[in-house]
């Protein structure tokens, strides 16, 4: 209903419909900014994504409307090598060491990638023909939900993460904990911390 969805087609390629934009996520890298940058590749209308490709589809101009698309078309398919989005033709649980898992959803902080439920990024269950993000821990993998700036991706193809959010309710300033680098900590372990 907000103009974004994740898709995965197992047996057929996908032509990006008129008025739509498709995105794949190729990485996350730490730069000079406070937050990691996401490496996003953008495909406009008429581009053909190969079968077995998980992707995000934006149809921002017709939010909440059904779109018609063509699949199993002939033509030159785009290169999606390095795509970190995963999906399956059936509901599938993804897990494994060396990765953090994020589900694409319109959650409490808006459209973005979130750890699913209480899984803390250790796994995710993805519905049939939908996509999730499997980010290697060797990349800059944020511990909180994060959001890609799709508008900037259309312009630059490489974007920054807009922000991360604390799960503490607004206005509740009791017992705010910081580490010695000034970063807010929700669940401290042993060590020295700054309170409030």
List the model feature ranges, each with a label:
Residues 18, 37, 137, 143-146, ...:
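Generic low-complexity segments that are intrinsically disordered, proline-rich and/or Lys/Arg-biased
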Residues 1-18, 43-111, 117-159:
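A short, polar beta-strand/turn micro-motif
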């Amino acid at each position: 209903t907000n103009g974004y969805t994740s898709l995965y087609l197992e047996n057929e390629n996908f032509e990006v419909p008129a008025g739509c934009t498709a995105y794949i996520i190729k990485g996350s890298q730490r730069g000079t900014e406070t937050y990691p940058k996401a490496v996003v590749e953008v495909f406009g209308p008429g581009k053909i994504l190969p079968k077995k490709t998980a992707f995000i589809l934006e149809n921002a101009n017709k939010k909440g409307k059904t779109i018609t698309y063509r699949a199993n078309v002939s033509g030159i398919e785009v290169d999606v090598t390095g795509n970190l989005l995963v999906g399956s033709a059936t509901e599938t649980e993804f897990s494994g060491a060396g990765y953090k898992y994020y589900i694409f959803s319109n959650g409490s902080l808006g459209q973005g990638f979130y750890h699913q439920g209480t899984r803390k990024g250790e796994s995710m269950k993805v519905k049939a023909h939908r996509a999730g993000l499997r980010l290697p821990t060797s990349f800059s993998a944020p511990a909180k939900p994060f959001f890609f700036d799709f508008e900037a991706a259309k312009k630059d193809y490489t974007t920054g993460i807009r922000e991360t959010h604390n799960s503490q309710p607004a206005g509740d300033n009791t017992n705010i904990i910081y580490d010695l680098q000034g970063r807010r900590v929700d669940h401290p372990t042993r060590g020295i911390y700054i309170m409030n």
